[in-house]
Amino acid sequence: MNIQHKEDTLIVQTGGNYKYYSVPVCVDSIDLTTEIARSEEKLLTGPSKHVEDPSYIESLFKNLYLNAPEYLKCQERCFLILKRLLLGPTSVPCAVETWDKMDYMNENPITTQNGTLYVYKKCCKCPNNCLFNCTVLTNYGTSHVFRGLLSLKKWETDTEPMICFCNRAVPNSEYIAVIFPGEQKITLDMYPHLLNILTRYISICDIDTITNDLIIELGSSLTNRICIHYKFLFNYAYIAKDSFTFVPDMDKEVILLELNKLIMTVECCTNFFFEKIWKRLSGDYDKYVTLLTLDASACPIIQTGTMREIKHLAAMLNVGLSYGKQKILKCSLQFQKRFIGFSEDDVIWRNLFLIYFNVNYPHHEETSPVKVPVQSSVKYHILLQRLLKNKRADEHETIVDRFVCGGMLNKRSTESYGTWDRNVETSVPDEFNEVVTIRDDAFCVNAFNTNRVINVRSINKKHVTTAPSCLTFNFVTDKYIFKEPACTISTFGTSGNTLQSLNINMKGSYVEFIYMLNVYRLHTNTFKFLLPATVCNSNSSLDIHGLLNQEVMRSDRNAVFWTTNFPCMITNINKINMGWFKAATAIVPKVHGDELRTVIKKEINFLKTSPSVNFDPFLHNMFVELELRNRCQIPLMNKQLVLTLYICLCMSNKCEISGIQKYLMTLVSEGVFDYSKNMLAHTKVKHVCAIAGSRVCNNVPKILHNKKKVKLDSFGRNANLLTFFGHLNVNELTDRQLSTIVKILIFYVQNIKHRGGICLLKRIIRKFLNSRVNKKLNGYDCRNNSTNNEHCRYPT
């Protein structure tokens, strides 16, 4: 099954969906998990062959998510998964006959003295979906075990029990085991990988809060179990082995965990910073832990390093600093005669700066956090909340979007989440979508990105003096125009010329953007880019297809205004000025994603409610399909070819129009009318002209009209035949040309029933009725169409 990753741009193949069951862990006051635990330890703590398989981990997490109560929201389901992982893996022994064995039972023959479950096929008539009945046997050999995660009954309201206890056996504990099928096994070395998926949807602060709440709720009996699994989530066993010798000190363990969580929030290029932190902590832990847990009110002095190095680190770690000659913030440090201020949420970063620059701060034994006699649970809670304060995101990604896969989900997941409007075909961020499709009933509009403006910061490898020293950060220092990939990059540099802001104007996909950054780095002295980038402006263009009376988009509109330099009508929707050109072509500036969809949907609502709109569903669907096949707008000549071919087939063949339409749709789907996006007629974008050359970009098809060259797209690139006819000069046409045009108009008269289309035809035909060959053409066409006199007459 395909799982789509929106953030990691990764597509993997995973297994199917499995249904989980619940099994009690305590029956008739007998704890069934005690004796089997020792034989299961080797399996849980040993290396797993699936830990290096990301598809297996994704499949395991997906099934944990799907086997949660249906009424829970996305974030609440993640909280439930976290609670299951904190309670950890468990095993319930059972004895079963060969003919009753099923996939949820794993072989592990041992002898139990306290008790084991003897399981057999359900023979009672209880109205439930249980598969087995059971009885408790003591001093009996166990043949199999149920493996899964420990949980609580109140959490697993929708998890079906596997065993019916209508006989004397009575489960008497609030704890149950959520058991997995034999194909799925969970081991402790999978915990960091599961945490990696969890942190996509919930923050580290949420994880700490849930952990502390769970310790308080379940009491001291399970505190040790929860803390152990909490450490495995953050791969504590590996960190302790490689960084420090293990010391059973609660403070030290928590500090190590918090620092490793902090590393997850920054980029891998900052390894040199944290390597020095680890080295100094491992060398003299007591000295540097005092700096690490220093209060925000203290103001230590840095005596090594340079101001440039401090700014460089702050930029790489994305830490905001303020500078002044007086102490203005509570959390600050002093360098020479200047004070450097941090926000109170960044106190841990200030303390890490102190360790990095090896600050000598007075060490008081009585105030050392290691020496303060505080209870472990309180100390644990305080340090967790103090060392790291992550900002919660306002929105979380919905996990269900990652499991969309064209009807391959089982019935339960489909009923739980409903149906989706579209399949996820790409894993590109919404800001970098090259085409956005908006569907509303019979209308479908494809909005194509014409260009986007992206802001990103960069750091230079070395100091290069390319600008005057008085230059401030808001002036352009350099401007680059690349042919491949096509982009224009403006550089805004600081006076030190180490940290720069890049303003990128480009058209293309997310992959082309990453490619462009690497090309830029090859031609400049850029050391690294401080991602993520910000798309601050995105412009899109769209065509309304199948609209016969195209002028309706620029007529009978309220609250619009016209530009003076070129004929463009502006509509204002949600404070966005949407420009309508000739022939139902529009541009939408500044917005992308959901904002773009909202603007276009309101324009579609105008089309649906306007009484003068005449809409051809076949032409609409055919051109929309052609756009989606080629992923770019249809050039002028390609559209005219398809339109004239359709009209000629309808006029020259006596077969039904539906057959012609079906034939044309088949040709479109087979790629007969495909085109290249490099066939665009002209452009004003400088970097696109740099690729093809200005001569090619200005090479627009022209015709000789009234001894002048006229561009064919002067009526609009999306113009249909009726729009062309409305601008023709009848006196300059030959008799044969007029005859052909009148035949086409008669065809439209016979097939257009809407008032808007009839009004348009009236205006066009009146022009032709005043021509010098009017009587001849009128009599010729009426004789050829005498079967239907009502439609042969021109409307007046």
From Swiss-Prot:
Protein family according to the UniProt entry: Belongs to the herpesviridae UL87 family.
Protein name: Protein U58
Organism of this sequence: Elephantid herpesvirus 1 (isolate Asian elephant/Berlin/Kiba/1998)
Phylogenetic lineage: Viruses, Duplodnaviria, Heunggongvirae, Peploviricota, Herviviricetes
